[in-house]
């Protein structure tokens, strides 16, 4: 977590960001700043634009309008080197996207060698360091099929870290995991936060957001409805839309009653 001064240059700066798919306006004027070393959790209902925002930050989706800056560089500038931008941003998805025919170590060394042009020895050294970082040194020679979902996600995090990113983006990293496997992944993310990694996390893990995030952003309908400290946004939200979302998320029985049309 961060102690970054509010006067310093934001590590991530999103300015009047819009994204449309045909007639569907998914993002409708997003303004967001994330300081160096800051952890920001983005929450909201399905279809609110959370994942699209994340994908626009590293240009997996091209914004319709607006600007995105990472480390002071405008990544949405028409002349930007997109590959260079993506080398500065690590991203972890819901699905692990590991190569099944490669060992864990090879999954970490391949992108280093192809993208960063590291030699085999250096790539292997960095791979080993980052597997240790996520607590999976003993799985270096294993293949993805022999790992649990949680272990595969930790390998995916190690793979992203091996590229030396300035910021890490997480898109629902635990949503595809069985409940008993979530804890180890969140523990790794907590460790990264305490190490000072700048992190933007789309999540429904409210305990993680409460304990680790510097700020929580609630999105709905393609806009930021509420942005503040976890104790405020989660514990005492000021907007009815936020309160309604959290009541359904934290009390599934209430959500079922509403869906059934009960009073």
Segments predicted by a language model, with ranges:
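C-terminal boundary and immediately downstream tail of ABC-type ATPase nucleotide-binding domains
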Residues: 232-263
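Generic structural signal for alpha-helix starts
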Residues: 5-7, 73, 239
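ABC family nucleotide-binding domain
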Residues: 9-230
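ABC-family P-loop ATPase nucleotide-binding domain
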Residues: 1-18, 253-263
């Amino acid at each position: 977590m961060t102690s970054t001064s509010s006067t310093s240059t934001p590590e991530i700066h999103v300015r009047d960001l819009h994204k449309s798919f045909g007639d569907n306006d998914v993002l409708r004027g997003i303004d967001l700043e994330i300081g160096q070393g800051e952890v920001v959790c983005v929450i909201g209902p399905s279809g609110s634009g959370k994942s699209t925002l994340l994908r626009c930050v590293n240009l997996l989706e091209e914004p319709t309008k607006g600007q995105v800056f990472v480390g002071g560089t405008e990544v949405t500038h028409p002349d930007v080197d997109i590959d260079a931008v993506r080398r500065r941003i690590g991203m972890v998805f819901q699905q692990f996207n590991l190569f099944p025919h490669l060992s864990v170590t090879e999954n970490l060394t391949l992108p280093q060698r192809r993208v960063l042009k590291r030699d085999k020895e250096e790539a292997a050294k960095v791979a080993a360091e980052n597997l240790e970082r996520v607590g999976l040194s003993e799985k270096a020679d294993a293949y993805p099929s022999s790992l649990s979902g949680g272990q595969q996600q930790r390998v995916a995090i190690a793979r992203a870290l091996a590229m030396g990113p300035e910021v890490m983006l997480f898109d629902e990293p635990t949503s595809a995991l069985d409940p008993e496997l979530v804890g180890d992944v969140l523990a790794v993310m907590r460790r990264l936060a305490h190490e000072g990694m700048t992190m933007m996390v789309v999540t429904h893990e409210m305990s993680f957001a409460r304990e680790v995030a510097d700020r929580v952003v609630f999105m709905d309908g393609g806009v930021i409805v509420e942005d503040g400290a976890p104790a405020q946004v989660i514990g005492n939200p000021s907007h009815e839309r936020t309160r309604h979302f959290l009541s359904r998320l934290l009390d599934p029985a209430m959500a079922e009653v509403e869906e059934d049309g009960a009073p």
